[in-house]
């Protein structure tokens, strides 16, 4: 769990 991954809108 990265912050970048969490904030990416998919």
From Swiss-Prot:
Alphabetized UniProt keyword annotations: Antibiotic, Antimicrobial, Bacteriocin
Temperature dependence: Thermostable.
GO BP terms: defense response to bacterium; killing of cells of another organism
Key word Cytoplasm present: no
pH relationship of activity: Active from pH 1 to 10.
Superkingdom of source: Bacteria
Function: Has antimicrobial activity against L.paracasei BGKP20.
Protein name: Bacteriocin BacGR
